[in-house]
Amino acid sequence: MRPVLRTLRDPRRCCRHPPLARCLVLFAIACAGLARCATVPKPPVKLEHSVYAMGTEFGIALYGPNATKLEGAAEQASEEATRIDHMLSNYIPDSELSKVNREAYDHPVQVSQEFFDLLEVCMRYSRESDGSFDITVGPLMKVWGFYKGSGHLPHRAEIWTALNHMGYRNVELDAAHRTVRFKESGMSLDPGGVGKGYAVDKMVSDLRAHGVDSALVSGGGSSIYGIGSPPNEPRGWYVRIRDAKDESKTAAVIYLKDSSLSTSGNYEKFFFAEGKIYSHIMDPRTGYPATGMLSVSVIAPRTLDSEVWAKPYYILGRQWTARHKPSDFRVLLCEDKPGATCKWLP
C-alpha cells in the first residue's frame, strides 16, 4: 500500500520513472478506491410520527437522509390531517360540514372551493355506484346508533324515516356561487366513507412536496398509501391484509409502491342483535347493513378512490365489481359463504 499512497500524494513523482504503465495503473486503482470510500451512502434515517384526527390515528413511517427534514415533513403532513378534520368533522361544531348540516335546508350555504370540489366528486361516486355510495347517509348511521359507537337495531319505521331524509339527488350544488343546499329537511352529510382517504392523499402530497420519496401513510389502518419503497425492498411496502374471521390469520400479502390500499370489513364496527351480526357498512338504498361479504380490499392509485370504492364493491358484490372496476384497480373479495376463500378479481 505504501507505493499507492505515495502515488496519491504526488502522482507526478511516480510518473517520472519507468515503468510508466505500472505507475498509471497504481494511480488509477488508488483513485478508484478513494472514490468508493467517498460515495458510500449513510444508512437512511427512519422516523415514525402520528396524529389523532377524524376519530382515529394517522400514522407516518418515513425514510430519508436528514432527520430534521423528515421531522418537518411529518409535522406538516400531520397538520394537514388536522386541517381536514376541522373541515369535514361532524363532531366539531364550527367545521364546514357541520355548518352545512345545520343550515343547508334553510338556505344555500357557501363553502370553500376545496369542500365544494370534494362534494362534486362524491356526487359522481354516487352516480357511478348506482347509489350504493351516498354521503348523505348520516340519518341512517344515526338511527342505527353508530354515531354513539355501540349500534342498536332500530324499528323499521325509524329506518323508513331516515331513508326519507337522505339521498344524494337531494343535494343541490351551485358552482357559480359555490353553495350547497338540501332539498329535504333532516338531511346530513357523513364523511365516514371519504374523509380518511382524502386526508391520506393530502398528507402524501405534502410529504412529496418536502422531497420525501419513501414513506407509508396510514389512516386508521384501513386506508394506507405507500410512497416509493423502504430501504432494501424494491417491491414496495409490505402490507398484510388480515383474515376477516381470524385476525391472527392472513388473507393476502401485498407490496404497495406509489399506490393505495383500503379495506372495508364487517369486523370493523358491528353489534349482535337477535342472534345476528349487524355491520356498520350500510346499503343506503335499503337502509340495512350490507350482507354477502366479509371484507373487500381495493388497491388504487389514490387513497380517496380505494376508500370510497371498497364499500360499493362490498355492497354490490363480485359480478357488479368485475364489470365496473377500472383496469388499474385490484380488488380482493372475501365472500361470506361456507368454504369460500378470499380471491383477487382478474
Whereabouts are the PLM-identified features?
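Mature catalytic core of soluble alpha/beta enzymes
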Residues: 2-18, 23, 27, 31-346
